[in-house]
Swiss-Prot record:
Residues that bind ATP: 30-37
GO BP: DNA replication; DNA synthesis involved in DNA repair; double-strand break repair; SOS response
Keywords attached to this entry: ATP-binding, Cytoplasm, DNA damage, DNA repair, DNA replication, DNA-binding, Nucleotide-binding, SOS response
InterPro entries named among the record's database cross-references: DNA-binding_RecF, DNA-binding_RecF_CS, P-loop_NTPase, RecF/RecN/SMC_N, RecF_2
Highest taxon of source: Bacteria
Keyword DNA-binding set for record: yes
Name of the protein this chain belongs to: DNA replication and repair protein RecF
Compartments reported by the entry: Cytoplasm
GO CC terms: cytoplasm
A single MF term (Gene Ontology): single-stranded DNA binding
NCBIfam families, alphabetized: recf (TIGR00611)
The species this protein was found in: Clostridium botulinum (strain Okra / Type B1)
Physiological role: The RecF protein is involved in DNA metabolism; it is required for DNA replication and normal SOS inducibility. RecF binds preferentially to single-stranded, linear DNA. It also seems to bind ATP.
Family membership noted in the UniProt record: Belongs to the RecF family.
Amino acid sequence: MYIKNVHLINFRNYDDMYLELSPNTNIFVGNNAQGKTNILESIYYSSIGKSHRTNKDKDLIKWDKNNTYLRTYVSRERLDKTIDINIFKNGKKAITVNKIKIKKISELMGNLNVVMFSPEDLRIIKDSPGNRRKFLDIELCKINNVYYHDLVQYNKILSERNTALKNWNNKINDIIDIYDEQLSKYGAFIIKERNKYLDKLNIIGKNIHKKITNDLEDINFRYLTNIKDFDNTEKELLIVLKKNRKKDLERNSTSIGPHRDDFEVSINNIDTRIFGSQGQQRTAVLTLKFASLEIIKNIIGEYPVLLLDDVLSELDSNRQKFVLNSIDKIQTIITCTGIEEIDKYLDKKQSQLYLVNNGKIKRV
């Protein structure tokens, strides 16, 4: 899988930009705030229907325009895909794939698979459990439409349950019983799929991490949940929800479920979030991203597109070398402010360089 070309109109700081891409390595070089990340953002949006930088679609529209247009042409082994997206300031958007209208975001996912690595991804390791849940949810939604559906349903019912808790009376108690059954059904599936994904990360990620660290470190991922019996997840989740209802009523929120879960990343049996060095935390994220590439490849039969947003400068020479030696079969799109540090690791025959300046791109 690779992107042949991208066409952007009124997207961020681009007026009308058409770009042909190499199926191998593409490097966009320029100073900060020139539009490098905007290119990656448009590709990411074409993949999952949302930005990695903002929750407001109107932020993507050039400040003095009423709409933006994105077209991404994707070469696939079986059938090429043309993804067209129109986003309007009034909040509406229209998406087609090969001229067929997309009614749900789940229908968009899977046409263009990407894995993005940006400096903000360090939050996966360093920050709150919400960042780790978000990572799992995004990766699973890319490859599992049922997961996407059940996650949407779970969040909808969770919101309704929390509203009911705030307006509790004896009649509402019966309604909460119904919510608990629905949450248990969808929540059990989410918990099981997250746990299975981490099992895959353990199998694939351990080898990747050993390569990066020259066999000096062993990495492990472990799902953290109140559910102990994964063979009876739905039943156990229902029991725990009922058990915690009094506490939930006092707090006006649901205290148990996959929306509260987490996963632990340990290196040599030490919690990386608390005790890991910054270098170890970066390596752990690198492992997560490259393991995700392999998981997608194993499921769909071809590698996704890799987006590296100004991260190579954050890595030491050993990690830079690992990244650039691992992308020969993967279309990779890199942004950076200069290539001096990574130039010696680049395969010049497989690399295409672009200069970015104030929303203008020049192929070198």
